[in-house]
Each structure stands twice: as structure tokens, then as C-alpha cells.
């Protein structure tokens, strides 16, 4: 059996130590990468669940904008509301150009209401329903035709139901943009 010289033995031991260190590093890197992948996956699930909660009515099902510390939100300094978009929702890629100016006016007022810090979704939706139903009453007075009123009421009901069932996320997003909470920074929308 050949004996290695002292320098060769030292070199061999250094090489073996380097190999062991590389293997440990590879295991550590894989372990860290696995944890990072798991963390990113959990974060994505959390993001999707929060979006679903916003869409379906918020945490309590009531669709209310609240500060996490329980304080009342206040208007964001210098906030400029976005221009109203008529009847539609960019969230769902829907824009309804119905061609009835008074209907578009109701939708625009509703958008502005959602962007008024501290205004409840319920109050905005009730004002919207009143505005829409007034259009149908005016159609009845002007035309006196029942079939036009029924078509108007069907359109109003469809719009209002859409707002009630799908309007939570747009409301919460508008409140987040228009309001500020003490001790909180604005988060990305």
C-alpha cells in the first residue's frame, strides 16, 4: 500500500472537506429554496383568498372598510378620484354602454360615492337603487307604456343585483384608495 506524502495527504483532506462543504451548501440551498417555494405558495393562496373575500363581501360578509386597529379611516390628503367609468366594472372587464344618459349618470354618481372615504357600501347602493328606480318612474310618466317600464325595471334590477353581489371588491378598492388609517401605510391595490 502506497503511503501518501504529507503535502499530498493535506491536499486530499482539503479536497474532501471542500466536497463535503459543497454538499452541505447544496442541501442548505435546496432546503432554503423549498421553504421559499412553500412561502410563496402560501402567499399566493392568501392573496387569492383575500380577493375572494373582497369579492364576496369582506371578512364579515358585510363589505365594510375598516382600519385594522379599529380606528375610523379618514380621507387621504391630496386624493383625486378617478374619472367615473359609466356602467361597468374594469375588475370584470365589463362596460355597459346602454345609451341612456340618465342611467350613466346614476352609475357615475355610484362610482363617486364608492370613492368617498367613510361612505358605506350600503348607503351608496341604496342611493344607486333610488336613482335607477327614478329613471323607470320618469319613463312611466313620459311614455305611459307598461312594456317600456317593465324593460326599464328589468335593466335596473340586473344592474342593481350586479352591484349588490359583485360590488364589494370595487367598493373596498375605492375606499383603500380614498382613505387612510392611522399607523398604516397604503398597501398596493
UniProtKB/Swiss-Prot annotation:
It comes from the Eukaryota. Keywords: Calcium, Cytoplasm, Hydrolase, Lipid degradation, Lipid metabolism, Metal-binding, Secreted, Signal. It is found in: Secreted; Cytoplasm. Its cofactor is Ca(2+). Binds 1 Ca(2+) ion per subunit. InterPro entries: PLA2G12, PLipase_A2_dom_sf, PLipase_A2_His_AS. Abundantly expressed in heart, skeletal muscle, kidney, liver and pancreas. GO terms for molecular function: calcium ion binding; calcium-dependent phospholipase A2 activity; phospholipase A2 activity. Ca(2+) binds at residues 88, 90, 92, 111. Gene3D superfamilies: Phospholipase A2 domain. It is an enzyme of class 3 (hydrolase). It catalyses: a 1,2-diacyl-sn-glycero-3-phosphocholine + H2O = a 1-acyl-sn-glycero-3-phosphocholine + a fatty acid + H(+). Pfam families: PLA2G12. GO terms for cellular component: cytoplasm; extracellular region. Its EC number is 3.1.1.4. Belongs to the phospholipase A2 family. This is Group XIIA secretory phospholipase A2.
Amino acid at each position: 500500500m502506497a503511503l501518501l506524502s504529507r503535502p499530498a495527504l493535506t491536499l486530499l483532506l482539503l479536497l474532501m472537506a471542500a466536497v463535503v462543504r459543497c454538499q452541505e451548501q447544496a442541501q442548505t440551498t435546496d432546503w432554503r429554496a423549498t421553504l421559499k417555494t412553500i412561502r410563496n405558495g402560501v402567499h399566493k393562496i392568501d392573496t387569492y383568498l383575500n380577493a375572494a373575500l373582497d369579492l364576496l363581501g369582506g371578512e364579515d360578509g358585510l363589505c365594510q372598510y375598516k382600519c385594522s386597529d379599529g380606528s375610523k379611516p379618514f380621507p387621504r390628503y391630496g386624493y383625486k378620484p378617478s374619472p367615473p367609468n359609466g356602467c361597468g366594472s374594469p375588475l370584470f372587464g365589463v362596460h355597459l354602454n346602454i345609451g341612456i344618459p340618465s342611467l350613466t349618470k346614476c352609475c357615475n354618481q355610484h362610482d363617486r360615492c364608492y370613492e368617498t372615504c367613510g361612505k358605506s357600501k350600503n348607503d351608496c347602493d341604496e342611493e344607486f337603487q333610488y336613482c335607477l328606480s327614478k329613471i323607470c318612474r320618469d319613463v312611466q310618466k313620459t311614455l305611459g307604456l307598461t312594456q317600456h317600464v317593465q324593460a326599464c325595471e328589468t335593466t335596473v334590477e340586473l344592474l342593481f343585483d350586479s352591484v349588490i353581489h359583485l360590488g364589494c371588491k370595487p367598493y373596498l378598492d375605492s375606499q383603500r384608495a380614498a382613505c387612510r388609517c392611522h399607523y398604516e401605510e397604503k398597501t398596493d391595490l
